Amino acid sequence: MIRAELDKDPRDVAAMFDSIADRYDLLNRVLSLGRERYWRQATVAAVDAYSGELVLDLAAGTGTSSESFTRRGARVIACDFSFGMLRVGAERRGGASRKGVTVVAGDALHLPFADQTFDAVTISFGLRNVHDVDRALAELLRVTKVGGRLVICEFSHLPVQPLDRMLGWGMKIGLPWVARQFSDNPDAYAYLSESIAAWPDQAGLARKISAAGWSRVAWRNLTFGVVALHRAYRER
């Protein structure tokens, strides 16, 4: 079985996501009990992309989330370092540049884009898997235009610690078990539950975003804090 460890070696993480690409979107819906769609809708609303804007959807996976940003006329670059994920998404859309979405292979720590390229940048359920989060946040700032915005949708922590520990225990046991019913690589989902447990809480991530140079950092909880939506701006 292919899985990554919490040191998040980029090659291991990419190989792990390659191995689950074919059924990734289905498993997301099952494991989130259908809440994944609501979380993505909240992310689209927070990005608030409109006609003429260019959006970077980093860690886009199969590009399911990317298509949502095009509904008001924005153009989207779907960037991911898992070739397996990008391949599955391109096959579903009928090409690497279709329906307002252009697929680009890239590393969050070395984004293949010029300074101040994007009006908005966003990453959903992917920042947690990056080897160097601080550097990735700085790279996202670099490629964002002055006045542009950042939206991060990521698993987080319930504000009541005993409940958060119970949820973490349930995910540690439940995610791999459910994944076994649908995936050839359930070990990958053991890594995902471990990475969620090790992730900073809402305030901790907000501090990281501010330290990277972003301004007006704010967040709100989705599903009681199971997921948090952070938003920030590049002011200079």
UniProtKB/Swiss-Prot annotation:
It catalyses: a 2-demethylmenaquinol + S-adenosyl-L-methionine = a menaquinol + S-adenosyl-L-homocysteine + H(+). It comes from the Bacteria. Keywords: Menaquinone biosynthesis, Methyltransferase, S-adenosyl-L-methionine, Transferase. One of its GO terms (molecular function) is demethylmenaquinone methyltransferase activity. Pathway: Quinol/quinone metabolism; menaquinone biosynthesis; menaquinol from 1,4-dihydroxy-2-naphthoate: step 2/2. S-adenosyl-L-methionine binds at T62, D80, D107, A108, S124. One of its GO terms (biological process) is menaquinone biosynthetic process. Gene3D superfamilies: Vaccinia Virus protein VP39. Its EC number is 2.1.1.163. The keyword Transferase applies. NCBIfam families: MenG_MenH_UbiE, PRK00216.1-2. Methyltransferase required for the conversion of demethylmenaquinol (DMKH2) to menaquinol (MKH2). Belongs to the class I-like SAM-binding methyltransferase superfamily. MenG/UbiE family. This is Demethylmenaquinone methyltransferase. It comes from Thermobifida fusca (strain YX). The lineage of its organism: Bacteria, Bacillati, Actinomycetota, Actinomycetes, Streptosporangiales. The gene is menG.
